[in-house]
């Protein structure tokens, strides 16, 4: 598929391993999780290996009182990159509520970018290309991939925001809380509209307007393209929902 070949070629220039200098950007990665199954528990532990990017600190925020919450704490204690583990009750705001809780209660001002992810994916190979391109593009919002399912948007399992635009993220999440009361309304009023609130944006993998993929979800409704992207490491993720 020619369009995929072009994307593979473009991705190669971002697959380098960066070196630490005095100008290396600092990154904070926030992992929102709900460790109510062993699959989700193991997803977080697995993903830490691939999120261990240069000059990157990690904060994990889990749901309180979940079955595998204590086990998660034990397993990640050996990862020095994890600076803090928080717990709050799970609610209808899902990952967005957890991410904003961290931003409101932890000092992120010393970081240049904040990356947001969750336990809905299992990462299968290094994603330096995502971090490298995010830094290179230096836009307010940087997603991993786009989608045209429902409307044009960036899927929210992995994205980054430049420090000076974090206030926009907090503002729109708080503003839309009155519209959110379920999983579907969280997707509708948080994920699908996120690109509307940022002036500059880009993503690592532009696939939303590929003719064979318009209006589809790459993880659930287009296995042909998904398998190609997985094998070429352009999309090195497995969705947990496909395993449980």
Predicted regions and their residues:
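ER/Golgi luminal nucleotide-sugar-dependent glycosyltransferases, focusing on the catalytic module
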Residues: 1-244
């Amino acid at each position: 598929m020619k369009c995929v070949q072009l994307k593979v070629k473009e991705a190669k220039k971002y697959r380098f391993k960066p070196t630490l200098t005095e100008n290396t950007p600092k990154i904070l990665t926030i992992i929102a999780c709900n460790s109510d199954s062993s699959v989700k528990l193991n997803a977080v532990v697995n993903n830490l290996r691939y999120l261990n990017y240069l000059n990157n600190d990690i904060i994990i925020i889990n749901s309180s009182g979940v079955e595998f919450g204590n086990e998660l704490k034990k397993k990640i204690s050996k990862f020095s990159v994890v600076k803090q583990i928080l717990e709050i009750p799970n609610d209808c705001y899902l990952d967005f509520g957890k991410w904003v809780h961290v931003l409101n209660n932890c000092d992120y001002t010393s970081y240049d970018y904040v990356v947001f992810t969750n336990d809905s994916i299992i990462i299968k190979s290094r994603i330096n290309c995502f971090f490298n391109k995010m830094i290179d593009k230096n836009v307010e919002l940087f997603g991993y991939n786009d989608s045209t399912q429902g409307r044009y948007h960036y899927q929210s399992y992995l994205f980054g925001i430049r420090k000076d635009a974090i206030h926009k993220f907090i503002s729109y999440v708080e503003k839309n809380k009155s519209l959110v009361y379920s999983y579907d309304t969280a997707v509708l009023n948080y994920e699908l509209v996120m690109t509307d609130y940022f002036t500059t944006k880009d993503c690592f993998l532009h696939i939303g307007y590929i003719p064979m993929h318009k209006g589809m979800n790459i993880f659930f409704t287009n296995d042909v393209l998904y398998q190609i992207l997985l094998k070429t490491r352009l999309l090195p993720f497995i969705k947990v929902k496909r395993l449980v």
